[in-house]
């Protein structure tokens, strides 16, 4: 960039913010600079107070049995580990000096939302915002680095909102016709579909519990739910309808499209699976734009929500971890660390595009946010059950047209200590080495053995790992209810439990392209189904205080 092209004031010394360079999407066409009086909103993630102490606290608590853990309170978190008020004051000065306004400050999450005209944003962050056209839709982005005044660079960990491309896709799959088209299923269609109640029975969810006293947060980046459809569905199952509330994030709201094949399918699948199995819990649905800023703000809003106070967060959206800017992944992971400290269990779908996660670069990829070590990654199986008993369960893999469970080895997150004895293989990518293994657990996800749900008033069958995240969310809600407190960060605990609390999946692979079949199911943990599908009552018993006291 020449001196003539610099968008910032010449007298300011600038520093590059690491991890913000973005590669443009394949087939994207640069259509020139963003102009006009459009107002741009940007989320700035500030450094936290005593971040090392927070990580140490989470590690200490994770080593304890769930009933013995001491979680931080939301009310005190902002003062102890949020961004400092002095840093917010500096960001306000920075904003005002560059023609921006500070619209919102979230102390606990450590985020500041700034807005202003295009020219002001360009000058403040040392970028030139540009329009890009793409077959999947146009978006705004920038080329090169993000640069801020050297005086405030140490305060800033990430900047979200300069790039508006969708960062995630919903991980659900509709059942297909034989010729490969998708179809809505009538009540009289093939019997290889289950209600959530059927699946819970097969997985031996503990009975006599309904999630009372819990709040399950569901993150949605599009679509909406129809209250009539939800009422129809829960009535058909003979269960009480849960309380469902919507929360608007960054202007997004509950906006059902009326198209059961669109994002409404994701939203209502999530609510219906979680609500059917934990009808006593409150379901809080956080709607946000499908951008990096929207996704982050939805998660931080849910995790730090002082009104609904979720104890569980279910995420059915994600994308290949290498499609995220490094700074964005780090900031999202920080939000998941917050959740762990607050005793919030976060679950995410592992993806529906096999070991490549839908990428076409010849490499193996895992999905984010499932790859975060603070997230319980949920893979997918093909379940055959009868009369409440599992007859056969294998890795879900229907090939490139039908989808397959995500899973593999992260290229970004190192191998966590709690996975060191799980025999996580090295990454299949050349020279990549070890890393966080994905998924942690699994459940029914094959559309051929999918979930019968009602989407926009239409009965259909849906699969995908999207169904597994709310399935486990409901199980955690029941466990929390029984324990009388949230289990919180579950990952380290699950890897210490006896293998008998899971149904081990030992057949299949997630090589969607049928190449080397590098990631295979096998005894114990594997990169297709993790530790296996749950045996719910055994999992609960293993987490009860009496069980932990009996262990050596």
From Swiss-Prot:
It catalyses: The enzyme preferentially hydrolyzes peptides having an Ala or Pro residue at P2 position and prefers such charged amino acid residues as Glu or Arg at the P2' position. In the oxidized insulin B chain, kumamolysin preferentially cleaves between Leu(15) and Tyr(16). Optimum temperature is 70 degrees Celsius. Retains 60% of the original activity at 80 degrees Celsius for 10 minutes, but loses its proteolytic activity after 10 minutes at 90 degrees Celsius. It is an enzyme of class 3 (hydrolase). Residues 1-17 have a biased composition (Basic and acidic residues). Optimum pH is 3.0. Is completely stable in the pH range 2.0-4.0 at 50 degrees Celsius for 24 hours. Binds 1 Ca(2+) ion per subunit. SUPFAM superfamilies: Protease propeptides/inhibitors, Subtilisin-like. Pfam families: Peptidase_S8 (PF00082), Pro-kuma_activ (PF09286). Inactivated at 22.4 and 37 degrees Celsius, but not at 60 degrees Celsius, by aldehyde-type inhibitors such as acetyl-Ile-Ala-Phe-CHO and acetyl-Ile-Pro-Phe-CHO. Insensitive to the known carboxyl proteinase inhibitors pepstatin, diazoacetyl-DL-norleucine methyl ester (DAN) and 1,2-epoxy-3-(p-nitrophenoxy)propane (EPNP). Not inhibited by Ala-Ala-Phe-chloromethylketone, an inhibitor of the human tripeptidyl-peptidase 1. The active site is at residues 266, 270, 466. GO terms for molecular function: metal ion binding; serine-type endopeptidase activity; tripeptidyl-peptidase activity. Ca(2+) binds at residues 504-505, 522, 524, 526. Its cofactor is Ca(2+). Keywords: Calcium, Hydrolase, Metal-binding, Protease, Secreted, Serine protease, Signal, Zymogen. GO terms for biological process: proteolysis. Changing residue 317 to A: Retains auto-processing activity and 4% of wild-type activity. Shows consequent structural changes. Its EC number is 3.4.21.123. Residues 193-546 form the Peptidase S53 domain. GO terms for cellular component: extracellular region. Its main location: secreted. Disulfide bonds: none annotated. The core of its prodomain resembles the prodomains of the pro-subtilisins and of the pro-protein convertases. The prodomain may stabilize (by interacting with helices h4 and h5) a folding intermediate of the catalytic domain. The catalytic domain has adopted a mature-like conformation already in the proform. Thermostable pepstatin-insensitive serine-carboxyl proteinase. Preferentially hydrolyzes synthetic peptides having an Ala or Pro residue at the P2 position and charged amino acids such as Glu or Arg at the P2' position. In vitro, specifically hydrolyzes the Leu-15-Tyr-16 peptide bond in oxidized insulin B-chain. Additional cleavage of oxidized insulin B-chain at Phe-25-Tyr-26 is detected at a considerably lower rate. Can hydrolyze collagen and the chromogenic substrate azocoll. Shows lower activity with albumin and casein. Shows very weak tripeptidyl peptidase activity. Forms monomeric and dimeric crystals. This is Kumamolisin. It comes from Bacillus sp. (strain MN-32). The gene is kscP.
């Amino acid at each position: 960039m020449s001196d003539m092209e610099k968008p910032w004031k010449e007298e300011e010394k600038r520093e590059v913010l690491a991890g913000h360079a973005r590669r443009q999407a394949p087939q994207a066409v640069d259509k020139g600079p963003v102009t006009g009086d459009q107002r741009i909103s940007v989320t700035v993630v500030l450094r936290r107070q005593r971040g090392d102490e927070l990580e140490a606290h989470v590690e200490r608590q994770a080593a304890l049995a769930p009933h013995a853990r001491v979680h931080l309170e939301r009310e005190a978190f902002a003062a102890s580990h949020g961004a400092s008020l002095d840093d917010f004051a500096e960001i306000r000065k920075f904003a005002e000096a560059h023609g921006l306004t500070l619209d919102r400050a979230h102390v606990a999450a450590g985020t500041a939302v700034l807005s202003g005209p295009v020219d002001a944003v360009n000058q403040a962050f040392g970028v030139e915002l540009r329009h890009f056209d793409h077959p999947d839709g146009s978006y705004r982005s920038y080329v090169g680095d993000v640069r801020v005044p050297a005086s405030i660079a140490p305060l800033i960990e990430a900047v979200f909102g300069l790039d508006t491309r969708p960062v995630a896709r919903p991980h659900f799959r509709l059942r297909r016709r034989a010729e490969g088209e998708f179809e809505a299923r009538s009540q009289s269609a093939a019997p290889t579909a289950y209600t959530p109640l059927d699946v819970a029975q097969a997985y031996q969810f503990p009975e006599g519990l309904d999630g009372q006293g819990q709040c399950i947060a569901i993150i949605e980046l599009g679509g909406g739910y129809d209250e009539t459809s939800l009422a129809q569905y829960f009535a058909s199952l003979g269960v009480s309808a849960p309380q469902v509330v919507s929360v608007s994030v960054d202007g997004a709201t509950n906006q059902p499209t009326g198209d059961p094949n669109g994002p409404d399918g994701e939203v209502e699948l999530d609510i219906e699976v979680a609500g059917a199995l934990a009808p006593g819990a409150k379901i809080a649905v956080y709607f946000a734009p499908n951008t990096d800023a929207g996704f982050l703000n939805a998660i931080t809003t849910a995790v730090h929500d002082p009104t609904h106070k979720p104890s569980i967060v279910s995420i059915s959206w994600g994308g290949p971890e290498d499609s995220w800017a490094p700074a964005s992944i780090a900031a999202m992971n920080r939000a998941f660390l917050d959740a762990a400290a607050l005793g919030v269990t976060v679950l995410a779908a592992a993806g529906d595009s096999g070991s490549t996660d839908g990428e076409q670069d010849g490499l193996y990829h895992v999905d984010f946010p499932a790859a975060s070590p603070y997230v319980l990654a949920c893979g997918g199986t093909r379940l055959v059950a009868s009369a409440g008993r599992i007859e056969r369960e294998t890795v879900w893999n229907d090939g490139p047209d039908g989808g397959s469970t995500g899973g593999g080895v992260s290229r970004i997150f190192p191998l966590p200590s709690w996975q060191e004895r799980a025999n996580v293989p090295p990454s299949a990518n050349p020279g990549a080495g070890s890393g966080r293994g994905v998924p942690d657990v699994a459940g029914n996800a094959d559309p051929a053995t999918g979930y019968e749900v009602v989407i926009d008033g239409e009965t259909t069958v849906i699969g995908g790992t999207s169904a597994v995240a709310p399935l486990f969310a409901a199980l955690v809600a029941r466990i929390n209810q029984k324990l009388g407190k949230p289990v919180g960060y579950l990952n380290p605990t699950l890897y210490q439990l006896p293998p008998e609390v899971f149904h081990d999946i030992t057949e299949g692979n997630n090589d969607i392209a049928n190449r080397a079949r590098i990631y295979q199911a096998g005894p114990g943990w594997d990169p297709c189904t993790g530790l296996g599908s749950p045996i719910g009552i055994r999992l609960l018993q293993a987490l009860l205080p009496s069980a932990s006291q009996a262990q050596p």
